[in-house]
């Protein structure tokens, strides 16, 4: 029986994780749940899964959650300290790190220091502090399993092979809702347009990141750290059908890929159950019904955020953390109707142009760089919205 702490249980990944837990009560048990603002859903999850600890991001929400959970045997905590307590619960074997954005850094780091294995859905952890987190994973002897569909595909395609034999890591991308939209048309797209992803059901922030292709840029940086691969070996192919989730090409010319229907339950289940597999209820892939699989290079002129992510990784040091922070602020501003879709890239670029990269030696320094990026991006958003 594997005990799980699920950080971000009310988000898309958290909800899917709990569906897998519910389908396999003989294999998984929930020891802790955490959430941001969706207290009603968190309370329903607590009633169903009976965790010992439940944490909310804001301490002021603790009384409200306690009221919603009246009569239940659960310890309710709040704030960063509460998230850390949930992430480091003694009985927990694995932490599902699914808090969106840089807010997941501190509890994920605490879980690693406490010796917990990690199912990593929070890509910002490695984007902003990849060198620090991979050092912690190594020094504390924990296992890190990717939950992103692309990185799970690479992880599976690498099994049993030597890293020296890798020629290329090929991340696939659907191209998002604007794959066939012209640059001129992008100037007028709405929030509703951007949230209408053709293949995947995801949270709002990651869906916008998919529309700008920043999501793929973050995944390139994440892959660099997860698989200890130089950037020049990591490539992106647009694959609109989202059937091949990623590939690895080896020096002998062979390519190994992972295929499946686009459903996040598959990579989540593999991370939870590795090295075994469990049933997910996903519709099986019927290759005979596929009319074709297509691949082509991304348009960096149209999807400028992708190029900015490559630039951030090339600059290194604090720049990826600043880039990620600026993206979070810009996406929020777009979702709130304060800036236009194409201005997301502008906010990120202007923030990066204002930053001089410097070495980051601790999580505290990463958070300082993150805050600088947020403050700078907010100022730019205010200027653009006036």
Swiss-Prot record:
It holds the Pfam family DXP_redisom_C. Pathway: Isoprenoid biosynthesis; isopentenyl diphosphate biosynthesis via DXP pathway; isopentenyl diphosphate from 1-deoxy-D-xylulose 5-phosphate: step 1/6. It catalyses: 2-C-methyl-D-erythritol 4-phosphate + NADP(+) = 1-deoxy-D-xylulose 5-phosphate + NADPH + H(+). NADPH binds at residues 10-13, 36-38, 122, 124, 203. GO terms for biological process: isopentenyl diphosphate biosynthetic process, methylerythritol 4-phosphate pathway involved in terpenoid biosynthetic process. The keyword Manganese applies. Keywords: Isoprene biosynthesis, Manganese, Metal-binding, NADP, Oxidoreductase. Its cofactor is Mg(2+); Mn(2+). It is an enzyme of class 1 (oxidoreductase). Mn(2+) binds at residues 148, 150, 219. Its EC number is 1.1.1.267. 1-deoxy-D-xylulose 5-phosphate binds at residues 123, 149-150, 174, 197, 210, 215-216, 219. GO terms for molecular function: 1-deoxy-D-xylulose-5-phosphate reductoisomerase activity; manganese ion binding; NADPH binding. Catalyzes the NADPH-dependent rearrangement and reduction of 1-deoxy-D-xylulose-5-phosphate (DXP) to 2-C-methyl-D-erythritol 4-phosphate (MEP). Belongs to the DXR family. HAMAP family: DXP_reductoisom. This is 1-deoxy-D-xylulose 5-phosphate reductoisomerase. The gene is dxr.
